[in-house]
Amino acid sequence: MGLSFSGARPCCCRNNVLITDDGEVVSLTAHDFDVVDIESEEEGNFYVPPDMRGVTRAPGRQRLRSSDPPSRHTHRRTPGGACPATQFPPPMSDSE
């Protein structure tokens, strides 16, 4: 099985976005595609009845951009690879 675009004819495709012949920018999602049998490409038959259409797999996790703020649970390492030593004041003696 493969995916075939079922919408407007693309003239440019980059990063899951296409520009239609009318200049409209369209963001692509898995729902914009029809499931097709790749072997049917040789026969030239790309039509898939609506009852056979479906998403074959869920979209993957999106990667974080470097401009995104870090999560509260994200642990960042120092350039040396180790956690920095915590600086505690010296213990107080009985004479103080």
From Swiss-Prot:
Record keyword Membrane present: yes
Consequence recorded when altering residue 54 to V: In strain: Nonneuroinvasive mutant HF10
GO cellular component: host cell Golgi membrane; host cell plasma membrane; membrane; viral tegument; virion membrane
Lipidated residues (N-myristoyl glycine): 2
Residue numbers covered by motif Di-leucine-like internalization motif: 18-19
Location of region: Asp/Glu-rich (acidic): 37-43
Keyword Phosphoprotein: yes
UniProt main location, coarse: virion
Domain remark from Swiss-Prot or TrEMBL: The acidic region is required for efficient packaging. It is also involved in recycling the protein from the plasma membrane to the Golgi apparatus, and in the interaction with the capsid-binding protein UL16.
Subunit: Interacts with cytoplasmic envelopment protein 2; this interaction is essential for the proper localization of each protein to the assembly complex and thus for the production of infectious virus. Interacts with gE (via C-terminus). Interacts with gD (via C-terminus). Interacts with UL56.
Protein name per Swiss-Prot or TrEMBL: Cytoplasmic envelopment protein 3
Native source species: Human herpesvirus 1 (strain 17) (HHV-1)
Higher taxonomy: Viruses, Duplodnaviria, Heunggongvirae, Peploviricota, Herviviricetes
